A protein has these predicted regions:
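Membrane-proximal linker segments that couple transmembrane helices to downstream signaling/catalytic modules
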Residues: 781-888, 913
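Ca2+-coordinating acidic residues in Ca2+-binding motifs
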Residues: 424, 572, 845, 877, ...
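Short coil turns linking two alpha-helices in DNA-binding domains
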Residues: 725, 853, 905-906
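Sequence-specific DNA-binding recognition helix
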Residues: 888-926
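Carboxylate-rich, polar loop motifs that coordinate divalent cations or form catalytic acidic clusters
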Residues: 1-754, 760-779, 783-784
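Short, Lys/Arg-enriched C-terminal cap helix and immediately downstream tail that follows
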Residues: 868-873, 920-928
Length: 933
């Protein structure tokens, strides 16, 4: 088992350079700030220290114990055995440290604890430690561990031995709050009240720094430039060859009482204080500026993880995390905050028009509001669409008042009186001839260049009534996406006799013609739908391929989408999705089994994952710089695909725990052979923190599963195997992050299931031999009895029996060896093929699969399993339902679905059978399982 864990330790440092930290060019308020408290499972809201072990887990010293976090779940970890502390003591973690070897050290109120290879070992004064209450831990370049104490001096731990250092070595101070090794290898020890001491050649020497008088040193840190930063109760000091500089709230520090200092991978210097967190910006002229946030929090600890997020431990506000936002927000000025944005339109370079639900129109130039227009008659009526005609006039589609043409400063209204199909307009599209197409709630209208308007509705051949969008292909055909499918007008002519239809009955939303299709396929169209996923249509053969959640999409309701840098970016009911166009094409050609679809939402900085006017093309736009703008119910969220960094760090995969026949098995003392065990339950995880809810898994029990089994994101990371036959098995699990980067090495456990002695072939043969010997002896002695006449043994005739009347099986011709073989086949059919899920299963059909008579099968079940056929089938069905209910969603619907899924035609029969075998209802059973988990 240790070897299994060290593989993780070796793999991940190799990829650290592929990640990006917090962008130093962004304002500190542009980062995303997440928070976890006891309500989210954190043991205590005071987080004193944070570290990360090479297996990816985040470790937290909290006010209520040691916690381990994988991005989804917090686990409280007991790190001291009961016999190591007195009954009146509680082990309280104070400081954490992970050294160069990946070992976790825990300083607590009862001593020093080492976590290595899955095991804890605690050192106390009985092992040579100077004091049990530990204040601070650090390690030097030589691998020595240095320990400072709450009231004492310091110890060095090396080669399993503690060496104390005190005033006899020149250390004239206790309460060492920080220990730093500078770039020259000199160790500096910062005491709370008596300044700093340097250590060399086994002795301590004062390290005088001007300006420390009457200051208490709380923290000390040396950055990559070699500057020494000292946090005190009266501000921050920077020490370098140019001199000593002091900083406090006058320079922007959130508070003068500095508690913790660290530098991240992007060289941002972070300072935690009594009143919040500050980022120190070091300018080229040598000056610094500070930005602060979270001023209501007292910051106790700071840590940057391997995915480059900054973690913040607070005094009583739990755990915070800063990460880069993938979205930026675009909002109306504060005086217009009551306006709800309903549509956007990218006009001339740098110009963006925004329509509101209140009927107002705003022009932004280079993201600055330059004009506000209130069209007469539009007050309180939402603007749903914006476009410009060939003459440069602006057109507005509205929610109930038709369309408006803006000519200079005047507005001209067009409604059903002027020939518009309907007054509720969803979108406006200008074709290559300059004609304007208006999508409405009752068909489509086209305004030709000569000013005439013609409508095309369901009575004229339109597939559907509500039109969402219009698209013109390369051949100048007009495609109409409506609520009942797609209608194609050849040449854009509504009177054409060659109208074509696609996706009849499917609510089509948006259409996009592939600019570079495979030549042999001809024109290729991508079509989004409201509920039926994404479609790929090849005109040459009229083939349509669907991409839904079953194929790996995160949602089935897809709205507008864009092609950028080889990926599709799609608005959906599950946020903004990114999927590789190449992967989609491979899946259509069966070149892969699943696509990797990444979803972005509020966790990535999006204002909201709910939209306004989502079925219209005017709910989003793509700028000339390939920025994507999305209209949400809380404003506009902007995404730049070119600036989104792919997380190339594959998630570590760990099998956390194993339960066999309901009993936990310690993985640090792994045994590979289990005798007579049948039920195995594996818990696994993949510690990752950028998008942990999007981690995907695949698992396989080699020796049982022939294929990998896909576990979608969000599902419980547990798998059950029941009634395993004796044999050799390897359970393997792999995972990929939200960007589709797989850890294909994963984690695995190899084990063997051995039969109990009475289940072995040797035992069965021995029993047969003994029985044969007894029978032979009985016959022999019977023949030898005096006066016994020799008679011929008459063959026992096979007698048919009525199973339903439970008649005894007399004169059976099933010999034990043949019966054993039949039982193996029966177990395989039940555990692997799960034939009991067939609602039409019968004694005759099952006997045929085993190649025996129904009478013989009935005899097997009765004599070997002590059941009749009906009980036998229903027992397996109920066992399968129990597995389903342990992971299914709440509700009667899931129970009903489970009943039908395993073969019950009658709910009454299902409930009776479930009560018979479990002595409770399905709902009661699920509640009991949740309590146990």
């Amino acid at each position: 088992m240790p070897g299994r864990k060290w593989l993780v330790i070796i793999l991940f440092p190799l990829t650290l350079l592929q990640l990006w930290g917090l962008d130093p060019n962004k304002s500190i308020n542009k980062y995303l700030l997440d928070q976890w408290q006891t309500s989210e499972g954190l043991p205590g809201n005071m987080v004193i220290s944070i570290e990360q072990t090479p297996d990816g887990f985040l470790w937290l010293a909290t006010s209520d114990g040691l916690a381990r976090f994988d991005g989804i779940e917090f686990s409280t970890i007991p790190f001291v055995r009961d016999e190591e502390i007195s009954p009146l003591e509680n082990a309280e973690p104070i400081t954490l440290l992970v050294n160069q070897e990946g070992i976790l050290w825990i300083g607590s109120n009862i001593g020093l604890t080492r976590f290595r290879n899955g095991r804890f070992k605690t050192f106390t004064t009985q092992h040579g430690l100077s004091e049990n209450r530990i204040r601070h831990l650090t390690y030097d370049m030589k691998g020595n561990l240095w320990i400072s104490f709450m009231s004492g001096y310091v110890d060095r731990f090396s080669e399993e031995k503690f060496t104390p250092y005190n005033d006899t070595h020149g250390l004239e101070a206790t309460k060492i709050n920080a220990i730093v090794e500078d770039r020259s290898g000199n160790l500096l020890f910062a005491s709370r009240e008596k300044g700093i001491f340097s250590f060399r050649d086994g002795r301590f020497f004062p390290y005088p720094i001007t300006g420390l008088d009457n200051r208490h040193i709380i923290a000390m840190y040396q950055d990559r430039q070699g500057d020494l930063w000292i946090g005190t109760n009266k501000g921050l000091l920077r020490v370098n060859p140019r001199g000593i500089t002091s900083y406090d709230s006058r320079q922007g520090l959130s508070h003068e009482y500095v508690i913790v200092i660290t530098e991240d991978s992007e060289r941002n210097l972070w300072v935690g204080t009594l009143k919040g967190l500050s980022r120190v910006n070091r300018k080229s002229d040598g000056t610094i500026g500070c930005e602060s946030l979270a001023k209501s929090f007292t910051v106790f600890s700071l840590f940057e993880d391997r995915e480059k997020s900054l973690w913040i431990g607070t005094e009583n506000s739990g755990l915070l995390r800063l990460k880069d936002s993938k979205f930026t927000s675009f909002a109306l000025p504060p005086r217009l905050q009551e306006e709800i944005i309903s549509s956007i339109f990218s006009d001339r370079p740098g110009d963006t028009w925004i329509g509101s639900l209140g009927g107002r129109l705003f022009l932004f130039r280079e993201n600055r509001l330059v004009e506000t227009i209130e069209p007469p008659g539009l007050s309180g009526t939402g603007i749903s669409a914006i476009a410009r005609d060939n003459e440069g006039n602006l057109w507005l589609g509205t929610i109930g008042k038709g369309v408006f043409q803006k000519k200079n400063t005047a507005f001209v209204q067009f409604t059903t009186r002027e020939g518009l199909a309907d007054n509720l307009v969803t979108s406006i599209y200008r074709d290559n001839h300059g004609n304007l197409w208006f999508s409405t709630f009752n068909g489509v209208s086209v305004r030709y260049n000569d000013g005439t308007i013609k409508s095309f509705q369901s009575g004229d051949g339109l597939s559907g009534k509500v039109v969402n969008n219009i698209y013109e292909d390369k051949s100048r055909n007009i495609w109409i996406a409506a609520d009942q499918g797609i209608t194609v007008l050849p040449g854009g002519k509504t009177a054409s006799s060659n109208i074509k239809y696609y996706l009849t009955g499917v609510p089509a939303v948006f259409i996009y013609e592939d600019p570079s299709p495979v030549e042999k396929e001809g024109p290729v169209f991508w079509i989004s739908t409201d509920g039926a996923g994404l479609k790929r249509l090849t005109l040459k053969d009229n083939m349509i391929y669907s991409y839904t959640v079953e194929q790996g999409m995160a949602a089935n309701s897809i709205y507008q989408f864009f092609a950028v840098h080889g990926n599709f970016w799609l608005m959906s009911s599950s946020g903004i999705l990114r999927v590789s166009k190449k992967e989609l094409e491979l899946l259509a050609k069966r070149g892969t089994d699943k696509i990797n679809c990444t979803s972005f939402g509020k966790a990535d900085g999006m204002q909201s994952d709910e939209y306004h006017n989502e079925l219209s093309r005017h709910s989003a736009l793509q700028t000339k710089d390939d920025e994507l703008w999305f209209v949400t119910i809380k404003g506009i969220s902007i995404l730049n695909p070119g600036k989104i960094h792919v997380n190339k760090l594959a998630p570590p995969v760990i099998i956390e725990s194993l339960f066999i026949d309901g009993q936990p098995i310690p993985l640090d003392r792994w045994q590979q052979v289990f005798i007579g065990k049948r039920n195995f339950k594996f818990h696994f995880t993949a510690p990752s923190f950028l998008s942990p809810e999007q981690i995907k898994f695949k698992y396989q029990l080699q020796g049982f599963n022939k294929e990998w089994i896909f576990l979608p994101p969000g599902k419980e990371r547990v798998v059950n195997y029941r009634n395993l036959e004796p044999g050799d098995y390897t359970f393997k699990v792999i995972a990929c992050n939200s960007d589709g980067v797989w850890n294909r090495t994963g984690d695995s456990l190899t084990f063997s299931v051995k039969p109990l002695f009475y289940e072995t072939t040797i035992f069965k043969i021995a029993v047969l031999l003994v029985l044969a010997a007894l029978l032979t002896g009985a016959v022999y002695f019977y023949k030898k009895r005096p006066g016994t006449e020799k008679t011929k043994l008459q063959p026992v005739q096979k007698q048919e029996e009525n199973e339903e009347d439970n008649i005894k099986y007399k004169g059976s011709n099933l010999n034990p060896i043949f019966a054993d073989e039949c039982m193996k086949k029966l177990k395989y059919l039940m555990s692997v093929e799960k034939v009991y899920c067939d609602a039409e299963i019968s004694l005759q059909s099952l006997a045929k699969k085993i190649s025996i008579t129904p009478h013989q099968l009935s005899q097997l079940i009765n004599e070997r399993l002590n059941r009749n056929f009906s009980d036998f089938i229903n027992y397996h069905r109920i066992e399968e339902v129990k597995i389903i209910l342990e992971s299914a969603d709440e509700g009667d619907e899931s129970i009903t679905n489970a009943a039908h899924q395993v073969g019950f035609n009658s709910l009454t029969a299902f409930y009776n059978a479930f009560k018979k075998y479990t002595h409770m209802t399905p709902t009661q059973y699920r509640k009991e399982m949740k309590k146990k988990s």
